[in-house]
């Protein structure tokens, strides 16, 4: 290319790159897992299986069957590059490319390990335990240091990131650290006031006080009864959205009682 042409004409060859190190750091790995809202509330531990490159146990990352040191590449004389002459519109020009024998390392392994073919690493599955903290939300990632891919030549491993997804819940809808729910309140209880129990995420019950005169669409806030704050003190709120349940079938006595109640209401209360 033009870069090679200018390099050849203007002395760029003197600044040619050094052969790359055979030992390279490994890449990070990503794993996705799913938990329930109850597990996100309390925190949990989850066993996962990961498939990554690990250190070759046969050669211990050297890539050599005898664990001998690599020797200087005879093709590029250890530079990791070879020069070639190519025809161009300017005539013959010298270009530089990666040595195909040593793949740019400047050295070769004379007796490659049969297990890893000289790479110093092999693919393997591993079982790990992930500690998932209370308060975690969908899309958040947990970093497990040095549990990712081992690098070429037995280089240091990258990190493993576990991305968490929280399943939808049949009762609660999460918004940040708040928990929303629909609370069905019988018409009589909405008028007179009552206490209702709902199952919470901790496995117990939360008592919700419904004041007399509660209207459809009203919200009742319970401070500190929501999701715990991730790695912090306190929790969000539980917010109950009231739906007043109007009976569809009435006994004669119930109908008579409601008619008496309606008859005693002032006119402005019926608007």
Where are these regions (language model features)?
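Long amphipathic alpha-helical segments used for membrane anchoring, targeting, substrate engagement
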Residues: 1-24, 67-72, 76-98
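Residue-level signature of catalytic and energy-coupling elements of molecular machines
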Residues: 5-6, 35, 59, 76, ...
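Charged, often glycine-enriched C-terminal and inter-domain segments
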Residues: 22-45, 107-271
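Short, intrinsically disordered, charge-biased short linear motifs at domain edges
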Residues: 41-48, 57-64, 83-90, 98-104
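Residues immediately within or flanking Cys/His clusters that coordinate Zn2+
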Residues: 53-56, 62, 70-73, 96-99, ...
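Short aromatic-acidic-glycine turn motif
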Residues: 56-58, 172-173
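Cys/His-coordinated zinc-binding microdomains
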Residues: 60-63, 74-80, 103-106, 114-120
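Short Cys/His-rich "knuckle" micro-motifs
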Residues: 66-70, 83-87, 109-112, 123-127
């Amino acid at each position: 290319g033009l870069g090679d042409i200018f390099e050849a004409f203007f002395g760029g060859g003197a600044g040619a790159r050094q052969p790359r190190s055979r030992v390279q750091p490994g890449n990070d790995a990503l794993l996705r897992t799913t938990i329930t809202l109850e597990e996100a509330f309390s925190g949990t531990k989850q066993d996962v299986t990961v498939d990554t490159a690990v250190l070759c146990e046969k050669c211990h990352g050297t890539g050599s069957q005898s664990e001998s040191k690599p020797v200087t590449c005879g093709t590029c004389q250890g530079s990791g590059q070879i020069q070639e002459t190519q025809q161009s519109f300017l005539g013959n020009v010298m270009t530089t490319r990666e040595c195909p024998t040593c793949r740019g390392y400047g050295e070769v392994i004379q007796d490659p390990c049969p297990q890893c073919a000289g790479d110093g690493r092999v693919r393997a599955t591993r079982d790990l335990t992930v500690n998932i903290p209370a308060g975690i939300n969908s899309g958040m990632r947990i970093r497990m240091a040095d549990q990712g891919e081992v690098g070429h030549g037995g280089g240091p491993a990258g990190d493993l990131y576990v991305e968490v997804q929280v399943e939808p819940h049949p009762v609660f809808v999460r918004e940040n650290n708040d928990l929303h729910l629909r609370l069905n309140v019988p018409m009589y209880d909405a008028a007179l006031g009552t206490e209702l129990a709902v199952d919470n995420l901790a496995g117990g019950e939360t008592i919700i006080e419904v004041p007399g005169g509660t209207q459809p669409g009203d919200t009742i806030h319970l401070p500190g009864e929501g999701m715990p704050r991730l790695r912090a003190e306190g929790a969000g709120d539980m917010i109950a959205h009231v739906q007043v349940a109007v009976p569809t079938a009435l006994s004669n006595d119930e109908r008579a009682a409601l008619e008496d109640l309606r008859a005693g209401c002032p006119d402005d209360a019926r608007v």
